[in-house]
Amino acid sequence: MSKRRVVVTGMGMLSPVGNTVESSWKALLEGQSGIVNIEHFDATNFSTRFAGLVKDFDCTEYMSKKDARKMDLFIQYGIAAGIQALDDSGLEITEENAARVGVAIGSGIGGLDLIEAGHSALVEKGPRKVSPFFVPSTIVNMVAGNLSIMRGLRGPNIAISTACTTGLHNIGHAARMIAYGDAEAMVAGGAEKASTPLGMAGFGAAKALSTRNDEPQKASRPWDKGRDGFVLGDGAGVMVLEEYEHAKARGAKIYAELVGFGMSGDAYHMTSPSEDGSGGALAMEAAMRDANITGTQVGYVNAHGTSTPAGDVAEIKGVKRALGEEGSKQVLVSSTKSMTGHLLGAAGSVEAIITVLSLVDQIVPPTINLDDPEEGLDIDLVPHTARKVDMEYAICNSFGFGGTNGSLVFKKIAE
């Protein structure tokens, strides 16, 4: 059967550099860092004392305080981004179309804040003091659940959780649901709030985080020789995906077309990528096959680019492998994690939005802090300054613990 076309008609975002898509995009193009010192708990004894935090978030713009008390912050962030995306799309939910509009929003970790609080209540005060809302306030599918309740969305309701590939996988699978007729529209993405004591301690114990405590805004430096680990970030990114003819019929504005989705597994290591980049390459190759394009047609790759010694090099090897010699010579590759940090389960969806905006505005955001590039990469990593470009296709990559990889291909919509 022939697939139906899928387009992006709405976007919403909370990130360390802005609480809307517009403010985040402006900050990224200007090369602003959203990394700050941690002040919401005492991080004195932690090896890493900074993160990419959401600032000045007011939950009452999106829900009542009563409802918010039953939700971990990752749920609140996801709902906020979802409401932004739905409002941006102009898609009206009616009794007639509700069953054809679904939600696919996940989280890599879920409600760490309230898990920690629930455990403290159990240990210090006993089982009767654990909140009756403990489970629904922390599990990963409750962004999708709560948003569907708030907006009356009765189509497919899922929450894929695949570590740092969560947001991208939810978008990719939501697109396939539309392509194969399960829905006319899907609200898709990821949300995360892992900058908690347990989250910071866990990633710190794994030696995954940068410890550049004297220069937090310079800590996330993908492909730079001085990189020493990733910077944890919080936030949410959500898209409204829609069947093309459905979007056209209602006069929706269309940002871009999602033409390719690919997945793969490294089958290599619990936390490290395959050194030759072959796992990531398989995902990119699958996405390009799905899009029916070659490597020479790709203008931009929004890289996973986390600022880890092994991962950054492996990804560039994968890009070269997937795009080929000619494609690699002309493509621009950048990592916006240099500014936002790594949003874990929200990274792929936030960066998918960034990739779409790059196509819309024909400009590539920079990789900041790339002062001394790793030798031998031989690819344009867009250091320091955003770059205007003429392109039709762009790729977004996400790779996660356990070797779970995903790539999306977006296409510019013709005027």
Curated annotation (Swiss-Prot):
Location of the Ketosynthase family 3 (KS3) domain: 3-412
Pathway linked to the protein: Lipid metabolism; fatty acid biosynthesis
Biological process annotations from GO: fatty acid biosynthetic process
Keyword RNA-binding set for record: no
Entry keyword set: Acyltransferase, Fatty acid biosynthesis, Fatty acid metabolism, Lipid biosynthesis, Lipid metabolism, Transferase
Catalytic residues (UniProt): 164 (for beta-ketoacyl synthase activity), 304 (for beta-ketoacyl synthase activity), 342 (for beta-ketoacyl synthase activity)
Record-listed E.C. numbers: 2.3.1.179
Reactions that this protein is recorded to catalyse: a fatty acyl-[ACP] + malonyl-[ACP] + H(+) = a 3-oxoacyl-[ACP] + holo-[ACP] + CO2; (9Z)-hexadecenoyl-[ACP] + malonyl-[ACP] + H(+) = 3-oxo-(11Z)-octadecenoyl-[ACP] + holo-[ACP] + CO2
PROSITE patterns: KS3_1 (PS00606), KS3_2 (PS52004)
UniProt keyword Acyltransferase, yes or no: yes
EC top class, as a word: transferase
Taxonomy, superkingdom: Bacteria
Gene3D superfamilies: 3.40.47.10
GO cellular component: cytosol
Pfam families in UniProt: ketoacyl-synt, Ketoacyl-synt_C
Function: Involved in the type II fatty acid elongation cycle. Catalyzes the elongation of a wide range of acyl-ACP by the addition of two carbons from malonyl-ACP to an acyl acceptor. Can efficiently catalyze the conversion of palmitoleoyl-ACP (cis-hexadec-9-enoyl-ACP) to cis-vaccenoyl-ACP (cis-octadec-11-enoyl-ACP), an essential step in the thermal regulation of fatty acid composition.
NCBIfam families xref list: fabF, PRK06333.1, PRK07314.1, PRK08722.1
Family, similarity comment: Belongs to the thiolase-like superfamily. Beta-ketoacyl-ACP synthases family.
UniProt xrefs under PANTHER family: 3-OXOACYL-[ACYL-CARRIER-PROTEIN] SYNTHASE, MITOCHONDRIAL (PTHR11712:SF336), POLYKETIDE SYNTHASE-RELATED (PTHR11712)
Subunit structure: Homodimer.
Protein name: 3-oxoacyl-[acyl-carrier-protein] synthase 2
Organism listed in the record: Vibrio harveyi (Beneckea harveyi)
Native organism taxonomy: Bacteria, Pseudomonadati, Pseudomonadota, Gammaproteobacteria, Vibrionales
